[in-house]
Amino acid sequence: MRISSLTPWAAGLAAASLLLLPSSATAGQRSASGSPAPAGASAGVSPAGVSSDAAVDAYYAAAEGKTGAALKTALHTIIKSQSKVTYDGVWNALKVTDQDPANSNNVILVYSGRSQSKSTNGGGVNDWNREHVWAKSHGDFGTATGPGTDLHHLRPEDVTVNSTRGNKDFDKGGSPVSEASGSFTDSDSFEPRNAVKGDVARMLLYMAVRYDGGDGFADLEMNDKVNNGSAPAMGRLSVLKQWNLQDPPDAFEQRRNQVIYDTYQHNRNPFIDHPEWVDSIW
């Protein structure tokens, strides 16, 4: 089930990556700024590494050979089996999942790319707080244990930048965001920096598969719109699919997925392990 270098998805990924990344960058070894990370940097963060191909294949065995709605349903069944974290527990979890590979005292802020002390979490200016990448008002789940505390879409972010992003959908364009170099925003959308465009896409797509309305929360769905308001939907899907190709999973994102699986929720984001499944479903 591993991705072949000859698949159409991989060919598209390679072409898209050339448009986005400097020639010196390598997928899987990018620092917060998007430049190449030192060799072995991710391995120094934690004993938790990336699962073997065999272990990942076994986890997704029930999805093998499926496409479209059948694949989405199979993945939902697999990933809905999980442990849940409380909203207070998210603070300490993010200090592990988003630890800076180069400084174990810091976390990397998702949109800013800034390395910041773990101890500066809170609600004050220049503190970092808990960003819901799938805006919690889109489906009105708030901070309830479940979608409101799911680590697969919660990331550390500067308080001011988090406020600027608000509950906007994701799309291209806008004005530069202060304290988040490479990010842009306008009245109805937010564009993250290049180094996490794919991360954002895969987090949102995970949420749309994991939460289907069957566990007391809204059925979260993707669409090709912005201005979704309080509807249980996020967009713009066509742009997010491009970002999934342009910014493939790197070592930081893969390690994060593994730590969530090993230590906290015991479920995985399938689109980090198999980014080609995005086009298979959508």
Located regions from the model:
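Bacterial N-terminal signal peptides that target proteins for export
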Residues: M1-A11
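General helical structural elements
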Residues: L6, G34, V259-I260
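N-terminal module-boundary/linker segments of secreted carbohydrate-active enzymes
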Residues: G12, L19-G113, W277-W282
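Compositionally biased, intrinsically disordered low-complexity regions
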Residues: A14, Q29-R30, P36, S42, ...
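Short, His- and charge-rich active-site/binding loops that engage polyanionic ligands
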Residues: V107-L109, G113-T120, G124-D127
